[in-house]
Amino acid sequence: MAYKLLFVVILVIGYLVYNQYNSDSSRRKYITFSAIVLGLQSALRNVAVGADTYNYYLKFEAVKYTTWQEVFRSFPDTYLYGDGKDPGYLLLEKIFQVFSGDFRVFLFLIAIVFFYAYAKLLSRYTNNTLEVLTVNLGYSALFYGFYSITGIRQTLSVALSILFLFSFIDKKYLKCILLFIVAFIIHKSSVFLLLVPVLYSIKKNKLLLYLYGLTFIVFLVGRNYFVNLALVASDYEAVEIPLPILLDIFYFVISLFIWKRLKYEDNREILSLFNVFCLTFAWIPLLGNDSPLMRVILYFNIYVLVLLPRAISRTSFYRNELFFCINLFFIYYAVDSH
């Protein structure tokens, strides 16, 4: 608890320092500061921290005794014969070990890639240092337990998915394709990235929200069926996974609040980003720590970090009180959980 509280305090102190200047330059400096702090928090963790960091460490060490021929053979073995998975991550480890065989340095590389994308996200969709603080605390509360201490392959894939979205928005389609290919060979769940440009391009937000609501009902009624189907497809035994009620209520309420505040947003890019995030709303019944479908939603719910402070900023009454309450909640949840 003390370790997590320390980093929360550092982020708050950074906000107090950079908020004095109230300029876009100070906002950007605070974003850089935050990315460095959160990156160090992730990279400096012990290999025993996190659900599977130690397993990743063992695999990293095993790659040292894997030949290049075996690495390249893993691609046809995986995609032609179904033997193996995510050969791109194996290739990444092997290339990295040309320069360093230290797993700690590898964790630094992962942190740099992810928090570079994180900083780009904040630079594009925040307006002031208070919004950046809210994003940082929201990350510490909602996403630290995955991106910062476990799930290295998907952490990379989600970082690439953010850059993939920006490339699509900026009409850099070749870069889009390359990012998708790299993300897919690192983690096969990245195939769901193909939904991102489709959802982003839909202009009728209200109609899409109704469709999400209908899907929500279908998934809620048939939850066990869909979750077990995903477990079987992922080569896991079909089991009953409990519904994470508090997390589901949070996303349900937050989705409605964001829509209520942003539906008259002048910035079309924000409304399109809401389309991407709001797939989380439909997916809520399928969430659960042991559900493979939880991994799918990570490509979409990350955008709640920038949409929530944006929605609060558009609230005409009790704006500061709302920021205070949500940040207090995030601090409590960040320190008390994981």
Task: Give, region by region, the residue ranges found by the protein language model.
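Short hydrophobic/aromatic helix or loop-helix immediately within or flanking a transmembrane segment
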Residues: 54, 58-62, 69-101
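Transmembrane-helix signature of polytopic, membrane-embedded enzymes
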Residues: 29, 122-141
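Start-transfer (signal-anchor) and selected internal transmembrane alpha helices
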Residues: 1-38
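Membrane-interface transmembrane helices that cradle and orient dolichyl/undecaprenyl
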Residues: 161-174
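Transmembrane-helix motifs of polytopic, lipid-linked glycan transferases
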Residues: 109-126
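Extracytoplasmic loop-helix module adjacent to an early transmembrane segment
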Residues: 28-35, 42-70
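Alpha-helical transmembrane segments and terminal signal-anchor/GPI-anchor hydrophobic tails
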Residues: 54-57, 63-68, 90, 192-303
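Multi-pass, polyprenyl lipid-linked donor-dependent membrane glycosyltransferases
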Residues: 136-137, 147-162
